[in-house]
Amino acid sequence: MSSLPALDLFLSKYQQAYVDQLGEQPRYYAQEQESDCVVGEMDSDGAVFWQGVVRDNPGQFENVESALELTLCPEINTFYGRHFSAPLFFDSKWGSGELIQVWNQTDFEYLQQNIIGHLMMKKKLKQEPTWFIGVLDDEDKMLTVNNADGSVWVEIPGELQSTKLAESLDEFISLLTPRVMPPVKPIEESMPELDHPGIWQRMKLMWNNLRGK
């Protein structure tokens, strides 16, 4: 598995930042989804304290590669398959945003389906393959990795990558600062398929808007 030391370091700094500023570990509205990340009991508001953990059995993307007949940049296995974690909020010189992570194995499988959907959309649009790692808070800007060379870019759904942020995923993560903030309650959606915690709702709304164009 490819190594992303910056991700391990960021997770460590993330946990410590919450302890230093709030005197507690970060909290997350997991909507009663179990995870090895959970520390203690759910609070009265429905949030859980959590801590990122290294998976006993790392997640892999061979099934996605086989389904699409495409070789993925190896960093995808480390970024999404090494840990279980809640989404990670950050500040950067490009603004604030979130990095996607997976909460449990079911979440990982859900992620793979979305990666496949994203790559199929890129193929349909006759664009080079990319895969997403998060979003910026500025409107509908995704953070994506160029599958050919591993560089990190800003991408708006349906368009080509527009602004290059770093030569590699490890370099990009090393430029981020953990953002300490209260847990964000998921927005209630009327469609059952959108009922998923946190960042996924934003990602799905972006793609739904694209399909509606």
Curated annotation (Swiss-Prot):
Pfam families: Syd
Gene Ontology cellular component annotations, sorted alphabetically: cytoplasmic side of plasma membrane
Membrane topology of the entry: Peripheral membrane protein
Record keywords: Cell inner membrane, Cell membrane, Membrane
Cellular localization per UniProt: Cell inner membrane
Chief location bin: membrane
Keyword Ion transport carried by entry: no
Family to which this protein belongs: Belongs to the Syd family.
Main function: Interacts with the SecY protein in vivo. May bind preferentially to an uncomplexed state of SecY, thus functioning either as a chelating agent for excess SecY in the cell or as a regulatory factor that negatively controls the translocase function.
Protein name: Protein Syd
